[in-house]
């Protein structure tokens, strides 16, 4: 068994062994994609005086990812059934109607239609 060294001594030994030159670049930290800023913006529109914990934000982010994945999978299935190679807004709309219950689906479809109309008119 090798002899134990103190934490500081081991760190110093590790640093001395590596030659750092100006050409060496720092590793870039990989960005973690999240819907957190958008969830926060919607929260502030609905309840301006309410905050959200990081745990709740993580849960909301997982929820949004899950719903998007379900919609995408259902839209893909619909396109495949109809022998189409492109997922259009029609497939997305049908997928939403199939996945979401009753009134929630109606609201989602109307908001989606409104967003698509706004996007196409801005072009």
UniProtKB/Swiss-Prot annotation:
Organism: Drosophila melanogaster
Keyword Zinc-finger: no
Keyword Coiled coil set for record: no
Main localization, broad class: nucleus
PROSITE patterns: HISTONE_H2B
Record's comment on post-translational modification: Phosphorylated by the catalytic component of the Dbf4-dependent kinase (DDK) complex Cdc7. Monoubiquitination of Lys-118 by Bre1 gives a specific tag for epigenetic transcriptional activation and is also prerequisite for histone H3 'Lys-4' and 'Lys-79' methylation. Deubiquitination of Lys-118 by the SAGA complex is involved in activating transcription of a large subset of genes.
Protein name, per record: Histone H2B
Compartment(s) where it occurs, according to its Swiss-Prot or TrEMBL record: Nucleus; Chromosome
Record region (Disordered): 1-30
InterPro entries: Histone-fold (IPR009072), Histone_H2A/H2B/H3 (IPR007125), Histone_H2B (IPR000558), HISTONE_H2B_site (IPR055333)
Positions of post-translational N-methylproline modification: 2
SUPFAM superfamilies for this protein: Histone-fold
Keyword annotations of the record: Chromosome, DNA-binding, Glycoprotein, Isopeptide bond, Methylation, Nucleosome core, Nucleus, Ubl conjugation
Function: Core component of nucleosome. Nucleosomes wrap and compact DNA into chromatin, limiting DNA accessibility to the cellular machineries which require DNA as a template. Histones thereby play a central role in transcription regulation, DNA repair, DNA replication and chromosomal stability. DNA accessibility is regulated via a complex set of post-translational modifications of histones, also called histone code, and nucleosome remodeling.
UniProt family annotation: Belongs to the histone H2B family.
Residues in cross-link Glycyl lysine isopeptide (Lys-Gly) (interchain with G-Cter in ubiquitin): 118
Positions of post-translational N6-succinyllysine modification: 44, 114, 118
Any single GO BP term: chromatin organization
């Amino acid at each position: 068994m090798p002899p134990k060294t103190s934490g500081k001594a081991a760190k110093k030994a590790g640093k001395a062994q590596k030659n750092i030159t100006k050409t060496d670049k720092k590793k870039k930290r990989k960005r973690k994609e999240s819907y957190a800023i958008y969830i926060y913006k919607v929260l502030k529109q609905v309840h301006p005086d309410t905050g959200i914990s990081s745990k709740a934000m993580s849960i909301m982010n997982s929820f949004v990812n899950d719903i998007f994945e379900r919609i995408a999978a259902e839209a893909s299935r619909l396109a495949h059934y109809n022998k189409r190679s492109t997922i259009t807004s029609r497939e997305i709309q049908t997928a939403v109607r199939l996945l979401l219950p009753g009134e929630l689906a109606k609201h989602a479809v109307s908001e989606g239609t409104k967003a698509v109309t706004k996007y196409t008119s801005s072009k």
